[in-house]
Amino acid sequence: MKRFPVTLTRRTLLASAAAVLVAAPLPTLAQTAWPTKPVKIVVPFAPGGTTDILARVVANELTKAFGQPFVVDNRAGAGGNFGSDIVAKAAPDVYALLMGTVGTHGINKALYNKLSFDPVKDFTPITLVAGVPNVMVLNADKARALGITSVADFITYAKANPGKLNMASSGNGTAIHMAGELFKAMTGTYMLHFPYRGSGPALMDMVGGSMD
């Protein structure tokens, strides 16, 4: 995918915030120094995951750049739809931005029959923050017990033991979930899917041994 550099300036952020805060009158915002109060960055997943970590880095830099606190607000649920809905329907006097993902603004539109918001019309993109690869990991103790040292070993075991391995994801419809389903389809394997409210809790359970 070709990426175009985007410079995040006060004018750019002001225009995009006005578009996200759809009820805010543009003339008023244009005449007012922005922001005049703290700004909420909604992360539609649980703390500790990639989206949350990136949001906190961005919030720290924006706080220094604009002189007002940018505060991360985790609102997990429904594969990112819960937090996205909060920002889409934010009141005019609320400064709210969303740290969206390919899941919240791409996959969910196709996955859910009806969303309470329009991921295109109710938001204006500001900038691409990061491109994040998907990585498959297996609990270390489980890998040693099963003698799995490679992806090929993993596929061989999964094919021979359908349903005996479980797969944690950051939520139904997320990019991680879709990547896992694609892996199963491409390899002819079957693993039980357990959706979490973010990659942070999923990773903790995988390290703890309750997830493979």
Q: Where are each of the predicted segments found?
A:
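N-terminal secretory signal peptides
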Residues: M1-L8, A15-A24
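Short, well-ordered beta-strand elements
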Residues: K37-F45, V71, A96, K164-A168
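Extracytoplasmic "Venus flytrap"
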Residues: I41-L54, A76-A78, S169-T174
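Sec/Tat signal peptide C-region and signal peptidase I cleavage site
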Residues: L26-A30
